Design a protein with these regions (language model features):
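ATP-dependent adenylation/nucleotidyltransferase module used to activate substrates
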Residues: 2-214
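ATP/NTP-dependent adenylation/nucleotidyl-transfer catalytic domains that generate, transfer
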Residues: 2-8, 212-312
Length: 312
């Protein structure tokens, strides 16, 4: 168990110290499993950095990409070029949302909402009574929405294919997850540390103490290639590094966290930059009606946004 203060101290270390720390964790993981390990590689900037660090220490560790069909086109292209192994899920995103429901507003809340709608009376009561483990007031309306809500797409489209790959090849995974990403990730790190050797699904998170700025700084100073949809990495007005285009490139059609996006949000930018995917997402997949229901805009308004983008 890692104390909160220790985690915070480690997150404040300079990048060079974090690189040394990460390599140490990779070596421990590799040696513990006799080299039977792999990198879960998404083509995004975090796993691109980790791939670079791993290849520096152990060039033989394969980078494995799960081709879900949900990546930004440039991320998918970059991942297919740089992965050593490509795997695929059994279902498409369309089949997942038809079977389980839409991913909104966050992984944890979607899980609570699904349980509030479909579990035993006791669990339903727990999810609706208020407090830490219940549906927040802001998202109560999703409990009675005319569509299903679920956190399961990540499990079906990513975790399941990777677990099958792990079983078939008898390899243990390394991921680029960072504690900084969410309170759920923070709790995971404090409970398990970087290398979780025990438990049902052993996993290594050697970049757990990194933060977004470290990733951008690493890319900038090492000049490694990365997916084009991030644009350039520049210093913003506040002295922080930033991407000139997308700064997060998870699954293109995912609604988790859209409520925290600035303006234009991910769907408004998608309309501008990826009109074909936008039409499929909003109309064919029905994401438009979900966003309408929760009052989140998804139409791009050029003049207003372009002024805002220029001042960004």
């Amino acid at each position: 168990v890692i104390a909160y203060e220790v985690m915070k101290q480690r997150q404040q270390l300079p990048l060079e110290a974090k690189i040394v720390f990460t390599k140490k964790k990779i070596r421990e993981w590799y040696e513990h499993w006799g080299g039977d390990v792999y990198l879960s590689f998404s083509g995004g900037k975090d796993s691109t950095v980790l791939r670079d660090i791993i290849k520096d220490v152990y060039p033989d560790v394969p980078a494995v990409f799960c081709d879900t069909g949900l990546e930004y086109p440039e991320v998918r292209e970059f991942a297919l070029e740089n992965a050593d192994v490509v795997i695929k899920p059994e279902l498409t995103f369309k089949q997942v949302i038809e079977k389980y429901g839409y991913p909104i507003p966050s992984k944890e809340q979607a899980y609570f909402i699904r349980q509030a709608r479909h579990s035993t009376p006791r669990t339903k009561a727990l999810r609706l009574k208020g407090g830490r483990y219940s549906v927040s007031n802001k998202w109560r309306m999703l409990v009675t929405a005319p569509f299903e809500v679920s956190e399961k797409c990540c499990d079906v489209l990513k975790k399941k294919p990777f677990r099958k790959f792990e079983r078939d090849r008898e390899l243990k995974r390394i991921t680029a997850m960072m504690a900084d990403e969410s309170s759920l990730r923070e709790r995971q790190y404090m409970q398990r540390g970087c290398n979780a050797f025990n438990g049902k699904n052993p996993a290594s998170m050697p970049m757990a103490i990194w933060q977004e700025q470290d990733v951008l700084q690493y890319i900038k100073q090492s000049s490694i290639e990365y997916a084009k949809c991030y644009g350039e990495i520049i210093e913003g007005a506040n002295g922080q590094l930033m991407c000139t285009k997308e700064d997060k490139t998870g699954c293109m059609f995912c609604m988790f966290g859209v409520q925290y996006d600035g303006t234009p949000n991910r769907f408004q930018r998608m309309q501008r930059d990826y009109p074909k995917q936008y039409n499929y997402c909003i109309n064919t997949l029905g994401i438009g009606r979900v966003l309408n229901y929760v009052g989140i805009p998804y139409e791009y308004q050029p003049t207003l946004f372009d002024d805002m983008e220029e001042t960004k």
